[in-house]
């Protein structure tokens, strides 16, 4: 419960689906989304370039691609609803954009959980200048 409170406090001021996405990540991984994923590797967080450093960073690359496939939506600001059924994330009823954004976030949160065993603390707060190569295509 304390972790949930810390995440809620850290996310005050964060708008739109970033709040829901953070709560999904916490629920799937048990990790604080801000400290564990906001600056991880070359793709987690704002922007991204180069080659993903590992499977977790690849989750972020795929998530960026998913958002990129939503040109008529605003993935970082459009809010959506979701709930859990038997532990699984279920996107709620909403607009087409809300549902597609939710599905992008859901897939990334599940990807993070599936790759917890290979999460590498070396890539937390990874410096951008080490992500030199041109980005892969989605």
From Swiss-Prot:
Annotated site, Putative membrane binding site, chain positions: 18-19, 34-35, 39, 46, 76-77, 79, 82, 124-125, 129
Gene Ontology CC: extracellular region
A Pfam family reported for this protein in Swiss-Prot or TrEMBL: Phospholip_A2_1
Protein name in UniProt: Basic phospholipase A2 ammodytoxin B
Major subcellular site: secreted
The species this protein was found in: Vipera ammodytes ammodytes
Localization per Swiss-Prot or TrEMBL: Secreted; Host cytoplasm, Host cytosol
Keyword Transcription regulation: no
Comment on bound cofactor: Binds 1 Ca(2+) ion.
Disulphide bond pairs: 42-131, 44-60, 59-111, 65-138, 66-104, 73-97, 91-102
Function: Snake venom phospholipase A2 (PLA2) that acts as a presynaptic neurotoxin, an inhibitor of blood coagulation, and has been found to bind with high affinity to intracellular proteins. The response of indirectly stimulated neuromuscular preparations to ammodytoxin (Atx) is triphasic. The first phase, the transient inhibition of the acetylcholine (ACh) release, starts soon after the addition of Atx and lasts for several minutes. This phase is probably independent of Atx enzymatic activity. The effect may be due to the specific binding of the toxin to presynaptic receptors.
């Amino acid at each position: 419960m304390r972790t949930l409170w810390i995440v809620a406090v850290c996310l005050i001021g964060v708008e739109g689906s970033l709040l829901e996405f953070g709560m999904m990540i916490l629920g799937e991984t048990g990790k604080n989304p801000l400290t564990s994923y906001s600056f991880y590797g070359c793709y987690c967080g704002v922007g991204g370039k180069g080659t993903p450093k590992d499977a977790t960073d690849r989750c972020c690359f795929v998530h960026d691609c998913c958002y990129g496939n939503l040109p008529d939506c605003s993935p970082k600001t459009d809010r959506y609803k979701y709930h859990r059924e038997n532990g699984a994330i279920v996107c709620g009823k909403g607009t087409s954009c809300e549902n597609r954004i939710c599905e992008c976030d859901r897939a990334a949160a599940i990807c993070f959980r599936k790759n917890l065993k290979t999460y590498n603390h070396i890539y937390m707060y990874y410096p951008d200048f080490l992500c030199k190569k041109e980005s892969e295509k989605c």
